[in-house]
Amino acid sequence: MAGAAAAVAAGAAAGAAAAAVSVAAPGRASAPPPPPPVYCVCRQPYDVNRFMIECDICKDWFHGSCVGVEEHHAVDIDLYHCPNCAVLHGSSLMKKRRNWHRHDYTEIDDGSKPVQAGTRTFIKELRSRVFPSADEIIIKMHGSQLTQRYLEKHGFDVPIMVPKLDDLGLRLPSPTFSVMDVERYVGGDKVIDVIDVARQADSKMTLHNYVKYFMNPNRPKVLNVISLEFSDTKMSELVEVPDIAKKLSWVENYWPDDSVFPKPFVQKYCLMGVQDSYTDFHIDFGGTSVWYHVLWGEKIFYLIKPTDENLARYESWSSSVTQSEVFFGDKVDKCYKCVVKQGHTLFVPTGWIHAVLTSQDCMAFGGNFLHNLNIGMQLRCYEMEKRLKTPDLFKFPFFEAICWFVAKNLLETLKELREDGFQPQTYLVQGVKALHTALKLWMKKELVSEHAFEIPDNVRPGHLIKELSKVIRAIEEENGKPVKSQGIPIVCPVSRSSNEATSPYHSRRKMRKLRDHNVRTPSNLDILELHTREVLKRLEMCPWEEDILSSKLNGKFNKHLQPSSTVPEWRAKDNDLRLLLTNGRIIKDERQPFADQSLYTADSENEEDKRRTKKAKMKIEESSGVEGVEHEESQKPLNGFFTRVKSELRSRSSGYSDISESEDSGPECTALKSIFTTEESESSGDEKKQEITSNFKEESNVMRNFLQKSQKPSRSEIPIKRECPTSTSTEEEAIQGMLSMAGLHYSTCLQRQIQSTDCSGERNSLQDPSSCHGSNHEVRQLYRYDKPVECGYHVKTEDPDLRTSSWIKQFDTSRFHPQDLSRSQKCIRKEGSSEISQRVQSRNYVDSSGSSLQNGKYMQNSNLTSGACQISNGSLSPERPVGETSFSVPLHPTKRPASNPPPISNQATKGKRPKKGMATAKQRLGKILKLNRNGHARFFV
């Protein structure tokens, strides 16, 4: 049979070509391969892209275009005779039609076989059937009403009909636009896919030949064109996609311009069908939604809702060998009929099963698009296509690749929504959960080889899946119950876009492009520029103005540490700068250290994602702290304690030292500490790390405040000539240099956490200026050590001059009971003899500790313990609201704003011999100044 021969033409030619290739034996010179065989009257080699037919007489192969045989005509030829053989044997013999209801019309019509879809008999029966009207389910609306906000709020789960083009954003040619105009814009030589409706089979032909067929009133067959995508042709300039389709489309919003995968073009199709063209029931590839606009003519849609039962029946029907013999509309409860007339536009949602009948010659335009509103259904349809082994030609191009792009961008979107204080929409959370499940499935060991090809280069699959898990878990914990991943929401919460106008983050979010996968890290020049501007401002100010500016700067920069979800709108705009300045010097930088730049990869924005995830986690932890504000009256004893501490500071007493040194005295304090230790052991590891880091930030605030006090000289000490109100002596500059270097070290710990320290700025502005004077000896004692404590370790510290040692622990006053608070006051009031005894015990302990800490180095344990640093300068822990004070343990020796310590006696040097030239503070300071003069400032870095 000539038709069967044409179907196997490719295999026969390929086999002949393979047999003609000779393989050289090892060690012998290979002869040049013979030329490939040639065929047809044109004597050209085999081309897989060109249709060929075999002559049943001479057995030679001919290109259909060379002998005037169309591909869709070849199936009707019984015996084919080539032009040479036709001279002797006559023309080709055609098949005889024996029925009108079967795809193979040569079958004998004995009435025993059912009608198949697409045949003439089937079309007649379909036209005569009665179906429920689609008016029961579809929504008719004006173009201006069809907005993204509407769909996000009400969902996109039923078809939408728009009778007019007004306000749709859809631009099309005039209704006089014909198929000949299509040929003129697209090109007559373009090869297109054509469906032979009676056989429900696909074939190829040129656009010119199809236009010729379309314009012929005597059409031997019913041919339908439904897949002419013209985005890469001149006709694309005549058509603009509806605005709603562009706003929702994954390809338009998430596909990166620099992707190695070619961008899918599925938004602009031209559909040309003659009367009685029929497309059987199907779901559009990849579960895409689709828009149709009838330019002229008419189309009838048969719509079936994608319920779980209907989808299961559809999959079973599609895989059946008798699919064409069963009308799927009879297998479901309801199949709705929707007539789309000239000028009407129909939007079909994800997963809807539909068939299309062209009731009269028609030209229509349409397009497919994936979107966020029904991600779960889209993935379900894609998995169904794979189970049904759908050919790649009928699948969405690079569906899995775009899922990775979308997952990466939706992760960013969810984090931004939670930072801005918006609750993510239900449909979005459901979609991300479905997407996360699909990505995990694709990355399984037994399946990863099938899906690895479509993983983008700039996506780290494992890391992305973990980050999605964290965000989903955090959202579920906030909502108090898991979010269901199945089903389509009928009513969605208010969209994020509806709140953008009132959001302080609107402009920032508007400027951010979702396709931007790179994160720019600020350079050191940016830091220096900001620092220089602040210093120049301060040089022009009086001392009292400087105090005000310092308090404002501290408050401003510390505000950035508060999670953005809890920052009021009037403070949200002051969070740009992250440098902490004191007297014109940088002592703390909250940004990512520059040293980490070498670790950045193509998707380095995940580092920023980690910080945002931690911000989101802290929202839950701070919720318990916010409740503490309501019980502020019950904590008056604790507030009274801090009032007394402030008064002691104003009188230059040793309030903090006394507290530190008398902390462990008395059984009541011991009992109180044990209670807190038990509660600490019950807290999670993440909470401990966050509170530890917040304590280091509080320590930095204490150092900054004390330095500002100590560097303001009394009137008798003001030099006659001053270049700047904040100028200091040479020794003070050296000490401040040490402080600046130490601050940079601490930033590596601080930059990973988010902590609110607003009250520190207020405290600076409220302190009495008369109490801001301190001796240089205090500064030397305060900043003795120059090696920072590693964040997250339980550290034992010893000060050889202060003769004190302390195990730094963490307490959380949000858990205090009134009895504990009164008990803590008793411990704090113990002074005098208890203070002296504590110092003696500390001195003895230092004497017996050996010389392990001779050079000011710390001993660090390798394992994390339940103890965590908590400093009492009034800063807030992650669970403490603004304005709530805290009961704290002894301050770290290098951060404690202690008063003048007792003189160093000879007893201090017993048990260990100090290093030569480093015995006293004066000798050590001289050593530091000498190093500065010799240009060894890098020693401190």
UniProtKB/Swiss-Prot annotation:
Region: Linker, residue numbers: 97-114
MF terms (GO), sorted A to Z: 2-oxoglutarate-dependent dioxygenase activity; histone demethylase activity; histone H3K27me2/H3K27me3 demethylase activity; histone H3K36 demethylase activity; histone H3K9 demethylase activity; histone H3K9me/H3K9me2 demethylase activity; histone H4K20 demethylase activity; iron ion binding
Cofactor note: Binds 1 Fe(2+) ion per subunit.
InterPro entries membership: JHD, JHDM1_Histone_Demethylase, JmjC_dom, Zinc_finger_PHD-type_CS, Znf_FYVE_PHD, Znf_PHD, Znf_PHD-finger, Znf_RING/FYVE/PHD
Binding residue positions for Fe cation: H282, D284, H354
SUPFAM superfamilies: Clavaminate synthase-like, FYVE/PHD zinc finger
PROSITE patterns on file: JMJC, ZF_PHD_1, ZF_PHD_2
UniProtKB keywords: Chromatin regulator, Dioxygenase, Iron, Metal-binding, Neurogenesis, Nucleus, Oxidoreductase, Phosphoprotein, Transcription, Transcription regulation, Zinc, Zinc-finger
Residues annotated to bind substrate: T279, K299
Taxonomy, superkingdom: Eukaryota
Comp. bias (Basic and acidic residues): 618-633, 685-700
Keyword Transcription: yes
EC number(s) reported in the record: 1.14.11.65
Record field: compositional bias (Polar residues): 834-876
Protein task: Histone demethylase required for brain development. Specifically demethylates dimethylated 'Lys-9', 'Lys-27' and 'Lys-36' (H3K9me2, H3K27me2, H3K36me2, respectively) of histone H3 and monomethylated histone H4 'Lys-20' residue (H4K20Me1), thereby playing a central role in histone code. Specifically binds trimethylated 'Lys-4' of histone H3 (H3K4me3), affecting histone demethylase specificity: in presence of H3K4me3, it has no demethylase activity toward H3K9me2, while it has high activity toward H3K27me2. Demethylates H3K9me2 in absence of H3K4me3.
Free-text note on domains in this protein's UniProt record: The PHD-type zinc finger mediates the binding to H3K4me3. Binding to H3K4me3 prevents its access to H3K9me2.
Family assignment from sequence similarity: Belongs to the JHDM1 histone demethylase family. JHDM1D subfamily.
Protein name: Lysine-specific demethylase 7A
Organism of derivation: Homo sapiens
Organism ancestry: Eukaryota, Metazoa, Chordata, Craniata, Vertebrata
